[in-house]
Amino acid sequence: MVIFAFKLKKFGMKDLNRIKVVLVEKKRTAKWLAEQLGRNPATVSKWCTNSSQPDLHTLDRVAELLSCEIRDLIM
């Protein structure tokens, strides 16, 4: 997934997910999301800045926690 994201960044498509936007819309924080997922806050921060991407299973869990569809979390 990292190589895929790197190649997309190289071609100018850097924002792959909208996790940060949806967190703001739902009035939640990245810290809260990290706690709910049992993940390191630095990992969630990387997702929010699009410097790395969650796997599909995690993205599904994020959607569930934020009461939205996966399609709402991706560009």
Regions found by a protein language model. Name each.
Residues 25, 51-54, 65:
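Helix-turn-helix/winged-helix DNA-binding modules
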Residues 2-29:
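A short, Lys/Arg-rich alpha-helix, primarily the initiator
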Residues 33-34:
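Short alpha-helical "recognition helix" segments of helix-turn-helix
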Residues 38-54:
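Recognition helix of helix-turn-helix/homeodomain-like DNA-binding domains
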Residues 30, 41, 56-59:
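Helix-turn-helix DNA-binding elements, focusing on the entry/boundary residues of the two helices
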Residues 57-72:
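DNA major-groove recognition helix of helix-turn-helix/homeodomain DNA-binding modules
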